[in-house]
């Protein structure tokens, strides 16, 4: 009899313990519930972001389009805006279309080592071409034709250009803005919270807190 009572007590205790475990257990959070902290930019990048906030907003007139039979027409794109740093180190062209791949930049006469051409025989390689893809902003890309204008309007130093015609898919504006500074060009894509700094001396992609 005593043995049976001990066994029954042990069974009840085990059941209560399991019930308590079930009551206290916390379900594993779903991926949507996990809070990912904003990236902490380096002091240099924070300085660039501060400059962008304080820069004067400017409006640049589209570069004149050219006749399709003009030999230089490849360098002047209709429905686009082209701008550069006053020193001519960085050129950018923004096309009037709300999709990735409609904004490109290029470094002229780079003083740093540009990426070498990967083994791809059927495309034209532009080592100084800057664009955004799945991996963020990169320099060195295969493009079918020049994607940045040969000539462009100078964007004055300490001035930013808000590309409000390049909107995110949900319609917010602006998606892109670029600032011209004596140390180079800074461009931010607010949809991806990724940006880059480019000059003759460097190309630096970075992430930044979405709330500037």
Model-predicted regions and their roles:
Residues 98-111, 184-193:
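Lectin-like carbohydrate-binding module/patch detector with strong preference for beta-trefoil
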Residues 1-8:
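Bacterial N-terminal signal peptides that target proteins for export
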Residues 33-72, 102-157, 198-212:
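A low-complexity, Ser/Thr/Gly/Pro-enriched, surface-exposed linker/loop concept
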Residues 22-24:
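Bacterial signal peptide processing site
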Residues 37, 75-87, 160-175:
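Extracellular glycan-recognition/adhesion modules and their associated mucin-like linkers
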Residues 151-159, 163-212:
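Extracellularly exposed regions in secreted/surface proteins, prominently low-complexity, repeat-rich
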Residues 17-20:
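C-terminal motif of bacterial Sec signal peptides marking the signal peptidase cleavage site
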């Amino acid at each position: 009899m005593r043995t049976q009572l001990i066994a029954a007590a042990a069974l009840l205790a085990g059941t209560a313990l399991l019930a308590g475990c079930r009551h206290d257990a916390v379900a594993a959070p779903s991926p949507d519930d996990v809070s990912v902290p904003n990236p902490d930019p380096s002091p240099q990048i924070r300085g660039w972001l501060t400059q962008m906030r304080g820069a004067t907003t400017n409006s640049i007139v589209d570069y004149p389009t050219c006749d399709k039979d003009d030999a230089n027409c490849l360098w002047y794109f209709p429905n686009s805006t082209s701008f550069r740093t006053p020193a001519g180190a960085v050129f950018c062209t923004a096309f009037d279309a709300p999709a990735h791949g409609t904004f490109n930049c290029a470094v002229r006469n780079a003083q740093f080592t540009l990426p070498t051409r990967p083994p791809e025989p059927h495309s034209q390689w532009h080592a100084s071409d800057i664009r955004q893809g799945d991996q963020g902003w990169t320099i060195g890309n295969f493009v079918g034709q020049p994607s940045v204008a040969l000539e462009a309007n100078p964007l004055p130093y300490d001035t930013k250009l808000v590309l409000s015609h390049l909107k995110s898919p949900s319609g917010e504006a602006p998606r892109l803005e670029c600032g011209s500074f004596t140390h180079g060009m800074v461009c931010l894509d607010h949809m991806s919270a990724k940006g880059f700094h480019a000059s003759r001396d460097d190309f630096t992609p970075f992430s930044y807190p979405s709330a500037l």
